[in-house]
Amino acid sequence: SRRYEKLPVSIFKEQEDASKMIVDDIIITANKKINEGKKCVLALAASSACIPVYEDLVKAYENGRLSFKDIEIFSIDEYYPLERNELQTHYRFLKEYIFDLTDIPQENIHCLESSKMDDVAAYCNRYEEQIKLSGGIDILITSGMGSNEPGSPYNSRTRLITMNHTTRVSAASDFF
């Protein structure tokens, strides 16, 4: 049987107002987790739509409202196969907008490997296990649904997918 979630939705006239609310929610969640002796786990997309949120997160860090020392970050998707430091990787994007601008320890950064590998399915299972060992995802920031293409099961996890034509056209600007 299908389950339908009832998620609270906020609609904002200005993108800046939405970004500030999201960052405030992250700060509240992070402080709560840290006060419980746990790390806050964020799952982040590499999308231009997320840049205002990431810029506000960096401002919060610079203003002393947020430290990334007890925050773990998981990337939610990646192009495959690309070498990690190629311009188009989501790792590079997150490095430019978050990792290099905050005090996040390297060991708290979990990005999907994008270079060619022998057993992608086993790697994806290990990535899911890392998320589980970290306590699960507290907050997900995305502009889509982690490249869930039409036909993807609603309960799907980390996996290799083939992007459909519409997604490829949308992503093409990353490569030119």
Report each predicted region and the residues it spans.
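Ligand-binding beta-strand-loop-alpha-helix segment within the catalytic cores
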Residues: 1-6, 66-139
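Glycine-rich beta-strand-to-loop/alpha-helix junction loops that act as flexible
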Residues: 44-49, 143-145
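Active-site catalytic pocket residues across diverse enzymes, especially alpha/beta-hydrolases
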Residues: 57-64
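Hydrophobic, aromatic-enriched interface-forming segments
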Residues: 137-147
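Class I SAM-dependent methyltransferase SAM-binding "motif I" and its flanking Rossmann-like core
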Residues: 146-176
